[in-house]
């Protein structure tokens, strides 16, 4: 099974158990760089997939919480290379598939071929690149696909139908359905409009769909889980870590029966 297939399988396994898969986002090295491996291990033990944010100086898709986390991680010296080194050194490796969410510049600086090689060495299963347009993703996609790694595309309520279909065909691992039109951590779309949008995304995708941006409660997870197999939790988990709470306990409180 390739790395991107492992991501899809983890999400489908949750559905097979009658629950909504949780994709848990943390910013690497935040709030405490020294406890990164410990935090990651605990999160991976409670989530189905872990999304690790690579800190960036201009995180344009992120809300205040993740911007703050990104600044805090950068202040502690966290870089893409440091993250890959830490992941490679983890023993045992995380219990759930790991994907990196990174803006494009750090990936370009490392180089796509070297990035893909380092990902394999570090146990990274795939990447989410929010500022990489689908029609410009070919070179990165080729480097990742050659090694069985995921390139996870994002769609939103304003994605045109043709682009939605293209993203549904191209995405590996899962398809990221942004359920707000703004930045992370904001209020989600509601009711029939949200369900109609997510239904269109599911129909267009050949891989599992995970909905994210603005998910903060077990009720939201349950509501979204009626339409999509997976839900992404980011800002709320980062804020829980800032409060010194157990990430496993927080994620357990969001889990569906």
Annotate each predicted stretch with a short phrase.
Residues 27-32, 101-109, 133-134, 154-159, ...:
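Glycine-rich beta-to-alpha transition loops that act as phosphate-gripper elements at the mouths
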Residues 22-26, 50-52, 98-102, 127-129, ...:
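Hydrophobic faces of well-ordered beta-strands that scaffold small-molecule active sites
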Residues 33-44, 159-169, 204, 211, ...:
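Catalytic cores of alpha/beta
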Residues 2-14, 33-34, 56-68, 75-90, ...:
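Active-site-adjacent beta->alpha loops and helix N-cap segments on the catalytic face
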Residues 14-21, 45-60:
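N-terminal glycine-rich anion-binding loops that anchor highly charged ligand groups
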Residues 49-58, 122-128, 132-136, 176-185, ...:
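Glycine-rich phosphate-binding active-site loops on the catalytic face of alpha/beta enzymes
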Residues 17, 46, 83-98, 122, ...:
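A structural motif corresponding to the C-terminal end of an alpha-helix
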Residues 24, 43, 50-53, 119, ...:
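Conserved, mostly hydrophobic/aromatic
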């Amino acid at each position: 099974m390739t790395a991107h297939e492992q991501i899809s399988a983890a999400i489908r396994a949750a559905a097979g158990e009658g629950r909504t898969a949780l994709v848990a986002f943390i910013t690497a090295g935040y709030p405490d760089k020294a406890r990164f491996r410990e935090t990651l291990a605990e999160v991976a033990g409670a989530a189905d997939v872990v999304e690790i944010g690579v800190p960036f100086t201009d995180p344009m898709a992120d809300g205040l919480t993740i911007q703050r986390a990104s600044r805090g991680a950068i202040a502690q010296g966290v870089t893409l290379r440091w993250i890959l080194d830490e992941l490679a050194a983890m023993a045992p490796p995380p219990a759930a598939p790991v994907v990196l969410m990174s803006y494009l510049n750090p990936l370009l600086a490392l180089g796509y071929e070297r990035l893909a090689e380092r990902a394999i060495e570090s146990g990274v299963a795939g990447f989410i690149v929010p500022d990489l347009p689908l029609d410009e993703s070919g070179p990165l996609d080729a480097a990742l696909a050659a090694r069985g790694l995921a390139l996870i595309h994002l769609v939103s309520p304003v994605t045109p139908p043709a682009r939605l279909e293209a993203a549904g065909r191209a995405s590996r691992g899962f398809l990221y359905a942004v359920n707000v039109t703004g930045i992370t951590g904001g209020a989600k779309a509601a009711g029939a409009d949200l369900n109609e949008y997510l239904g269109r995304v599911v129909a267009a995708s050949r891989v599992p769909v995970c909905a994210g941006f603005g998910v903060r409660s077990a009720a939201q997870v349950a509501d979204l889980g009626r339409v999509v197999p997976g839900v992404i939790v980011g800002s709320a988990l980062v804020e829980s870590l800032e409060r010194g709470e157990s990430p496993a306990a927080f994620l357990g409180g969001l889990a569906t029966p």
